[in-house]
């Protein structure tokens, strides 16, 4: 598998060794130990093997200006999304208000920084809408909708995350626009985590997505074979 990635076997192996060398345990991070780091890294290479010919979004500006991405807020305001998300606060006041809300009302939203870019590929919107509908139909009463914690990122932003100590690898399915992270741990309080896990794993078994258990959130990457079908689904749903 590693030989089929853009870095090749040697490059992927060297990257993994470097990541192991720089690893620092931190209970706030999804990578709990070196074993988890190796597992998550290797499974995430499936993404870049699948999409090895796809160009990455190198800068924040490219993400903001890409015609391949749609504005989630525009869709949300028209009730066209079947999942929730929140944007990253851009000010100190906003971050403080977010932290206070988490303490006072922990059931309102998961403990996540939110999306830097409220943009996504049309096919990813269709996938997440489909998962969201299925989850709502099978989750216990009172469980909130599917919650998306990460979507498209630029390589520029990925480097910023690395500087903060996160396991943000390059290349990445997020930088190609074909990956998303969905909240898992928060749904324990509603008795819905196992339901969501089984729905995601069923899609993995069907070959629709790659799924990586990262602890608090699970990482999803769309399989290339599903792209055409989900593009048609999006166009039908949005009456394009």
What residue ranges belong to the model's regions?
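Extracytoplasmic cell-surface/polysaccharide-interacting catalytic and binding patches
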Residues: 1-128, 213-215, 223-240
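Short secondary-structure capping micro-motifs at structural edges
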Residues: 115-116, 132-136, 165-169
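Solvent-exposed, polar/charged alpha-helical surfaces in well-ordered, non-transmembrane soluble domains
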Residues: 126-129, 133, 159, 194
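Sec/Tat-exported extracytoplasmic proteins
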Residues: 131-139, 186, 204
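Acidic helix-start/capping segments at beta-turn-to-alpha-helix junctions
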Residues: 143-158
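Charged, often glycine-rich, active-site loop that binds/positions anionic groups
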Residues: 155-170
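Catalytic cores and adjacent binding grooves of peptidoglycan-active enzymes
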Residues: 167-240
């Amino acid at each position: 598998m590693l030989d089929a990635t853009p870095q090749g076997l040697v490059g992927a192996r060297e990257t993994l060794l470097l990541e192991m060398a720089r690893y620092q345990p931190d209970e706030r991070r999804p990578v709990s130990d070196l074993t988890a780091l190796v597992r998550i890294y290797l499974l995430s290479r499936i993404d870049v093997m699948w999409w090895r010919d796809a160009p990455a979004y190198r800068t924040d500006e490219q993400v903001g200006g890409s015609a391949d991405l749609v504005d989630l807020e525009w869709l949300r305001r028209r009730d066209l999304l079947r999942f929730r998300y929140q944007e990253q606060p851009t000010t100190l006041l906003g971050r403080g208000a977010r932290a206070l809300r988490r303490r006072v009302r922990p059931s309102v939203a998961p403990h996540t920084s939110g999306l830097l870019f409220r943009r996504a590929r049309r096919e990813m919107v269709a996938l997440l809408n489909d998962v969201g509908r299925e989850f709502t139909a099978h989750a216990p009463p009172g469980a909130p909708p599917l919650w998306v914690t990460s979507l498209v990122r630029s390589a520029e932003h990925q480097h910023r995350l690395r500087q903060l100590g996160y396991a943000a690898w390059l290349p990445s399915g997020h930088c190609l626009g074909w990956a998303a992270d969905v909240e898992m741990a928060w749904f324990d309080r509603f008795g819905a985590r196992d339901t969501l896990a089984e729905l995601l794993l069923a899609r993995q078994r069907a070959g629709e997505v790659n799924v990586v258990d990262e602890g608090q959130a699970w990482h999803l990457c769309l399989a290339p074979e599903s792209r055409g079908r989900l593009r048609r689904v999006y166009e039908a749903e949005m009456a394009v």
